[in-house]
């Protein structure tokens, strides 16, 4: 959250004075709001790498690594780690408020039922070298998902936004399936189908490590640890990946491409 300060900053250009408001963040950070600079003066600011520029107003997360502070939507990470789960925190990050139980149950059910990918996507893995970087494979496969859901990836902003809830849940679900398949491809192992009777992280570990002779269903300790790890990394403020996604999505790209 931010608020406008009564203070203003004056910039003098070509013998003309221009005043700009000061914005104060919830943690006391101060910024100059120069959004009207070009319209007023014809000038723009140059700040290579955005080292001194806030790219947007955000209410999603706050990080102060030096002081060990992390908040998602205003909730301290310690509180979420003790009382929440990754999927509940993901819902919180996306929609701004902790969901009621019925809403959370519906969201979790949608995620659980969306883990499988079309069998024809299995053949995509034949085109990757065994030494290909996992992130290159993951990004390629996620982008390919859009071709299987044309109604969600039309690049028509209004149409794609009307499917946002379903698309977001689908991607949260399938990213673990694709990650597990990528790992097993690189290890030369057969793919393992998802089991929607398991938890989000339990199913991911199952798809990663189960074998025909060993079904890893009882691994609550590892599953809970992984859930906590994902919860901690649910959002990371305005880092490179977030900024890139914001830039791509602002052009109207669908959620799969973003």
Predicted regions: what they are:
Residues 2-258:
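Hydrophobic alpha-helical bundle cores within soluble ligand-binding/oligomerization subdomains
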């Amino acid at each position: 959250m931010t608020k406008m300060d009564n203070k203003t900053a004056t910039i003098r250009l070509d013998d003309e004075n221009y005043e700009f408001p000061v914005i104060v963040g919830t943690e006391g950070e101060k910024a100059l709001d120069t959004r009207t600079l070009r319209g007023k003066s014809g000038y723009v600011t140059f700040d290579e790498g955005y080292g001194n520029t806030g790219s947007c107003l955000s209410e999603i997360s706050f990080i102060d690594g030096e002081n060990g502070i992390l908040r998602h939507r205003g909730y301290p990470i310690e509180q979420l780690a003790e009382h929440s789960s990754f999927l509940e925190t993901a819902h919180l990050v996306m929609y701004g408020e902790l969901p009621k139980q019925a809403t959370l149950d519906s969201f979790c059910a949608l995620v659980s039922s969306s883990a499988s990918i079309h069998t024809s996507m299995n053949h995509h893995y034949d085109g990757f070298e065994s030494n290909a970087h996992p992130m290159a494979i993951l990004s390629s496969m996620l982008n390919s998902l859009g071709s299987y859901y044309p109604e969600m990836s039309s690049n028509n902003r209004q149409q794609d936004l009307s499917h946002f809830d379903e698309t977001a849940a689908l991607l949260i679900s399938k990213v673990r399936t694709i990650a597990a398949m990528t790992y097993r491809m690189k290890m030369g192992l057969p793919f393992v189908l998802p089991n929607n009777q398991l938890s989000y992280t339990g199913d991911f570990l199952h798809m990663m490590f189960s074998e025909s002779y060993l079904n890893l269903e009882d691994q609550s300790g590892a599953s809970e640890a992984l859930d906590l790890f994902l919860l901690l990394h649910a959002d990371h403020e305005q880092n490179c990946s977030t900024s890139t996604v914001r830039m791509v999505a602002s052009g109207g790209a669908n959620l799969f491409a973003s």
